Amino acid sequence: TQMYLVIFPEGTRYNPEIPKVIADSQSFAEKEGLAILKHVLTPRVKATHVAIDTMKDYLDAVYDVTVAYEGTVDHKGQRKLAPSMTEFLCKECPRVHIFIDRIELKDIPEEQMYMRRWLHERFEIKDKLLIEFYDAKDSKRRNKFPGKSVHSKLSLKKTLPSLLFLGGLTASMLLTESGRKLYVKTWIYGTLIGCLWVSIKP
């Protein structure tokens, strides 16, 4: 079965508002003799190694994806938290930039020890891309990734069917008393469960 498996080797999000996570990541890299990264966290190799090793007979390549957001640097030049979906839809973040690099499977070391070095080198490349994106002294080079770019806009043709489906589903629920009760319960219990999950998950 054709599929994609997405892995975030850092294990958690890079959040400038939680400096302890960034500091812990950098001290781990220093302790292990690895390059200290500024705009990304130090990757851990285990899950990546297990995934690639298990799927190697079905893979021909791995895609290294780096994402950056415009409008997320404050007046002091410090990175802010990545925008939420609401902030993005309200145009507080004008564009999302995605840099994709295709790596042939044959170019990825099989042994975990060597794959660890390879993975960290990939994150060093990501870090350089993001330093250029966020911190470039030349303003013309800021908010851009190098190389040829393709601009992609969400067309009405792609978004309208989802809007009509979800809008129709919500409207049909709100037309009946039992539907309204279910709608309210979904909001209340969904929010409570979500808050509980966020507070107890490691």
What are these regions (language model features)?
Residues 1-202:
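Non-catalytic C-terminal accessory region of glycerolipid acyltransferases
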